[in-house]
């Protein structure tokens, strides 16, 4: 087999971009403790071991796809933190590969710039290392736009099937698909209207479509079957299929009421809010922020395909700005189209001057993203003063969980240790201790029937109430689970943990 080194050399920049992206998303992947949401997602995947399927809940605001991906990853590789995060990492890297495919429409320089900006983006790296749904939604949103442009420019059947498959996967991922699909659809009449005051150049008329009615029936028929398959819990719970439309009432209510996630400090006029723009500026998402400005260029006569992307991107940003519910990881659903727009403007400017001038423009932008991204992901990943660090579990949790897991892994009988966790909010602990069979979880209004447990966790404010009930010697470990939660105290039975922790018990009951 002969290797075409000339062809390989031509693709070296793309290979380098992907390798950098993989490194930033995989290196020290378990350095950051499991997030609250990761614990919930992992717990849902764990329940599939008991029930055999994922029982869809329309009030959970997330589709079933990520839970099945996590279940598969943990089944293949074990219940490890890196395995929990592996599906999201895969989706994040595939998103970069998908952006590179836009060279078919916008040329290689624009596609490479967009992919490199995503590879280095602090947000895409930070949340690409989280086991949450958003990375999947980004991937499928990119593929939907790719399919739309493909149908527009070539009309090929493959783009019809890609469109159906990508929309289906968006629906399976998160209810915000309505927002993204809505923006893509509404951008069409806006594009058609705007051509009158500002004619496009070039216009790119709709290509002759090569697909048939049978292709449409096949593509969307298969999509419907796939949706029913996953939402019905692999055909085991058909009543859950109604959640496909029931979820939107709950999602709309949460989106408007915000549930403590509103960002009123950034309000402008009425429902308008500049939180996302402020986040781009604060968190070194400068390529995307300049991409917002670059999008204004397409108000003037310009390539109608870029104009369509600009309208869609602006509509998505506007929609997320109006919605009251704002969590920082949603930003990755908005950034990527602006990379394409900035790349297009840079490519246009450089073509009129000198290609080397590109690096004088691009390097400071990407260097800022890389600097902050490395600092955020590998040094200050639990610092609450950082906007992307949001209800993140503190490293303190390891002071409690590591001794428990160490004892359990050294002796299989350790997974039979009894525990009582008495916290109002205790995730990600149920996922961390998912292999233990005798742990009870209690809220502030309930207590265990006895106190003779191998480990106990309480709010520190209840120490004086709980300690008189302890009948064994315990080591006392204070820790903070996350911001917004009171300090916690863990009690580890001395007869189980004294050697592991390496100190004498703090509490010794009187005979």
Model-derived regions: residue spans:
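Membrane-integral, polyisoprenol-dependent glycosyltransferases
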Residues: 2-356, 363, 367-368, 376-377
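Loop/turn elements at helix/coil->beta-strand transitions in domains of secreted/extracellular proteins
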Residues: 175, 415-416, 436, 451-454
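Flexible, charged surface loops at secondary-structure boundaries
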Residues: 220-221, 408-414, 446-453
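Membrane-proximal, lumen/periplasm-facing interface regions of secretory-pathway glyco-
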Residues: 251-252, 358-437, 484-509
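Solvent-exposed loop/turn segments at secondary-structure junctions
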Residues: 317, 445-447, 461-465
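Short, hydrophobic beta-strand segments that form beta-sheet elements in well-ordered domains
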Residues: 419-423, 441, 456-458
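A short, well-structured beta->alpha microelement
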Residues: 433-450
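Aromatic/acidic, Gly/Pro-rich catalytic loop(s) in extracytoplasmic/lumenal soluble domains
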Residues: 451-511
């Amino acid at each position: 087999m002969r290797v075409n080194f000339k062809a390989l050399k031509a693709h070296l920049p793309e290979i380098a971009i992907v390798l950098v992206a993989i490194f930033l998303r995989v290196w020290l992947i378990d350095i950051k403790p499991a997030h609250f949401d990761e614990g919930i997602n992992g717990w849902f995947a764990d329940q599939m071991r008991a029930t055999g399927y994922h029982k869809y809940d329309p009030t959970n605001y997330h589709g079933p796809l990520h839970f099945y991906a996590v279940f598969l990853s943990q089944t293949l590789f074990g219940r490890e933190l890196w395995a929990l995060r592996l599906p999201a990492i895969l989706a994040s890297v595939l998103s970069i590969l998908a952006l590179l495919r836009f060279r078919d429409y916008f040329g290689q320089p624009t596609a490479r710039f967009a992919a490199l900006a995503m590879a280095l983006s602090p947000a895409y790296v930070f949340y690409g290392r989280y086991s949450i749904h958003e990375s999947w939604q980004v991937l499928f949103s990119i593929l939907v736009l790719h399919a739309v442009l493909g149908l527009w420019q070539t009309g090929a059947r493959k783009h019809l099937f890609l469109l159906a498959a990508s929309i289906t996967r968006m629906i399976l991922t998160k209810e915000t698909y309505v927002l993204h699909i809505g923006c893509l659809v509404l951008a069409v009449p806006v594009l058609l209207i705007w051509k009158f005051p500002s004619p496009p150049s070039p216009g790119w008329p709709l290509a002759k479509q090569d697909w048939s009615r049978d292709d449409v029936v096949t593509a969307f028929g298969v999509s419907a079957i796939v949706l029913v398959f996953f939402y019905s819990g692999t055909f085991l719970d058909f009543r859950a299929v109604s959640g496909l439309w029931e979820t939107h009432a709950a999602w709309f209510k949460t989106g408007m009421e915000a549930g403590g996630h509103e960002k009123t400090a950034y309000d402008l006029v009425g429902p308008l809010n500049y939180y996302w723009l402020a986040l781009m500026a604060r968190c070194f998402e400068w390529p995307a922020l300049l991409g917002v400005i670059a999008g204004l260029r397409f108000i003037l006569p310009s390539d109608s395909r870029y104009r369509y992307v600009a309208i869609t991107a602006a509509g998505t940003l506007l929609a997320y700005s109006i919605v009251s519910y704002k969590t920082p990881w949603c930003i990755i659903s908005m950034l990527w189209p602006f990379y394409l727009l900035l790349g297009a403007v840079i490519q246009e400017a450089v073509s009129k001057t000198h290609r080397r001038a590109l690096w004088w423009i691009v390097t400071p932008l990407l260097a800022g993203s890389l600097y902050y991204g490395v600092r955020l992901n590998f040094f200050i990943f639990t610092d609450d003063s950082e906007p992307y660090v949001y209800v993140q579990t503190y490293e303190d949790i390891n002071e409690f969980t590591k001794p428990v897991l160490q004892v359990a892994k050294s002796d299989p009988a350790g997974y039979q240790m009894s525990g009582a966790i008495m916290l109002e909010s205790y995730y990600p602990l149920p996922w961390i201790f998912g292999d233990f069979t005798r742990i009870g979880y209690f809220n502030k209004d309930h207590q265990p029937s006895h106190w003779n447990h191998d480990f106990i966790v309480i709010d520190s404010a209840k120490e004086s109430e709980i300690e008189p009930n302890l009948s064994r010697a315990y080591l006392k470990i204070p820790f903070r689970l996350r911001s917004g939660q009171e300090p916690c105290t863990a009690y580890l039975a001395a007869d189980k943990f004294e050697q592991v922790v390496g100190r004498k018990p703090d509490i010794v009951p009187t005979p």
